[in-house]
A protein has these predicted regions:
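Active-site phosphate-binding/coordination module
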Residues: 33-131
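Short, hinge-like loop/turn segments at secondary-structure boundaries
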Residues: 72-75, 94-98, 146-147, 187, ...
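Short, structured coil segments at secondary-structure junctions
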Residues: 72-73, 81, 164, 222-223, ...
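Mg2+-dependent phosphoryl-transfer enzymes with acidic/Ser/Thr/Gly-rich catalytic loops
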Residues: 5, 12, 17, 37, ...
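Conserved acidic, metal-coordinating active-site core of Asp-based
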Residues: 115-222
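Active-site T/S-Asp motif of two-component receiver
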Residues: 24
Length: 276
């Protein structure tokens, strides 16, 4: 939303009670200092136990996301900014679904490695993210995970990627670039349709999105129930669209507060099937 962010407690209980699914960023939204806390994991379990759908959507790579897709109580993880969905089959084995076919992925992969090398050559201090070995459909430049790039260097990385015809977004830790029409919103629509047989746009009022950075702006713009964890304020002046609500807690603590707000409203509502 373009206006000021409202405190989470201003989210009407009647709206919270109707939520059937939560889409969330991972780094610095669900996790804290690079790991999921016990409280955040319990919040995921509580949401799932109440019958809500939960789908984390991240710029992190497939390789990084695989273990969490198997371990966390979520419907799926959508990795690499909407390109790949990781879920479990009936036997609990990892299943990967792609938006692009194998030939297109191979062609794009080769092009992206060339762009990554150009970024490293042309932007002082730029380094390829340490998790890049697990990436299949994008590239990532570290700006805040294991190194620090000043804002002008981050802007230059984005400019180089876009000059090569790539999409480029900035998360709380990386600059991600990729070829293709997918993004977090397209990935959310695709995953909900493919895995849950639901039309996300037809029931937007029943879904919430939680995020923390400029990489979430498209989701903040699209979802009426959008929430930023408190550390979103780091990026507040750069947000073309702000989340409607903001938590008091940062990172995983903020996510826990969102889960508690939804569950409290649902528990106070008499009867009803959450997956109608």
């Amino acid at each position: 939303m373009p206006g000021a962010m409202q405190p989470l407690q201003d989210w009407p209980a009647s709206e919270r009670a109707g939520i059937v699914g939560v889409l969330t960023d991972i780094d610095d939204t669900l996790t804290t200092e690079g790991a999921i806390t016990r409280d955040a994991l319990q919040a995921l379990e509580a949401l799932a136990g109440a019958g809500l759908h939960v789908i984390p959507i991240t710029g992190r790579p497939v390789g990084w996301s695989e273990a969490f897709a198997l371990q966390w109580p979520v419907d799926a993880i959508v990795a690499e900014n909407g390109a790949v969905a990781l879920t479990r089959d009936a036997q609990g084995r990892l299943r990967k679904l792609y938006q692009q076919d194998a030939a297109e992925r191979a062609t794009n992969f080769a092009r992206m490695q060339q762009v990554a090398q150009r970024v490293v050559r042309e932007v002082p201090g730029a380094t390829i993210s340490r998790d890049s070995g697990g990436r299949e459909t994008d590239i990532a430049i570290d700006h805040s995970e294991f190194t620090h790039l000043p804002q002008d260097a981050v802007d230059r990385v984005v400019a180089v990627m876009r000059s090569e015809g790539m999409n480029a977004t900035v998360s709380s830790i990386h600059v991600n670039g990729w070829y293709g029409s997918h993004d977090k919103l397209a990935g959310a629509r695709w995953a909900v349709r493919t895995l849950l047989a639901r039309d996300l746009d037809a029931e937007l009022e029943r879904w919430a999105y939680v995020g923390d950075s400029t990489n979430d702006v498209l989701m903040f713009q699209h979802f009426p129930h959008s929430i930023g964890v408190a550390n979103i304020r780091r990026f507040e002046q750069q947000l073309a669209f702000k989340p409607r609500y903001v938590t008091e807690g940062e990172r995983g603590e903020g996510f826990v507060q969102v889960a508690q707000a939804i569950l409290a409203a649902r528990h106070s509502r008499a009867g009803g099937n959450p997956r109608h």
